Design a protein with these regions (language model features):
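N-terminal leader/targeting and pre-domain segments
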Residues: 2-55, 136-139, 144-154
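Short, structured coil/loop segments at alpha-helix boundaries
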Residues: 3-4, 61, 65-69, 95-99
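Generic ordered-secondary-structure signal
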Residues: 24-26, 34, 64-65, 78, ...
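A generic short-segment signal for beta-strand/edge and adjacent turn/coil regions
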Residues: 26-31, 80-86
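Short linear motifs at secondary-structure transitions and domain/linker junctions
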Residues: 32-37, 61-63, 87-93
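Local sequence-structure signature of Cys/Sec-based thiol-disulfide redox active-site neighborhoods
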Residues: 44-83
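Thioredoxin-like thiol-disulfide oxidoreductase module
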Residues: 73, 84-153
Length: 154
């Protein structure tokens, strides 16, 4: 009977150790930018604060009013597909000071782009208006996937 209890305890210990080890490895390799596809619209001051305090993630800077909704939908779908989230700054936000540029709010990217930042530094960006609307979501997914591999995964 003692051998049976010892065996059960040993097996339980191994299972627990494997579970902890797997959780550690999974968290070690997890991305800093994971999420569920949410694209959070920030005010200019919120963006400035985010870039100063964190500055890591996918950032969309919108300027073209007519294409903003189309671009946002494609970016959201690509983010959902790649399990990441991002932030958006609209150049026509009521609190966006027209005498200032996106640089004044912590962004170095061009207008109508999705960019990836790490610790406040622009790593790369994709120009949304350079792609045919029928291919944009695919291009965005590829951009996000390669950015995750290059900048956020060990």
């Amino acid at each position: 009977m003692k051998n049976k209890k010892w065996l059960i305890s040993a097996v339980a210990g191994i299972v627990v150790a494997l579970g902890i080890g797997t959780a550690f490895v999974s968290s070690y390799n997890s991305s800093e930018v994971k999420g569920n596809g949410e694209l959070e619209e920030l005010s200019p001051l919120q963006m400035k604060k985010f870039m100063k305090e964190d500055g890591t993630g996918f950032i969309m800077f919108s300027f073209n009013k007519e294409n903003r909704d189309l671009y946002m939908n494609d970016v959201k779908r690509a983010m959902q597909q790649e399990n990441v989230e991002g932030k958006e700054l609209d150049g026509h936000h009521p609190k966006f000071d027209g005498s200032k540029s996106q640089n004044d709010y912590g962004l170095d990217q061009h207008a109508d782009t999705l960019a990836v930042y790490k610790d406040g530094e622009l790593k790369q960006q994709i120009e949304l208006d350079e792609y045919d609307p029928s291919n944009l979501e695919t291009e965005l997914s590829h951009f996000i996937e390669t950015s995750k591999e290059m900048y956020f995964e060990e």
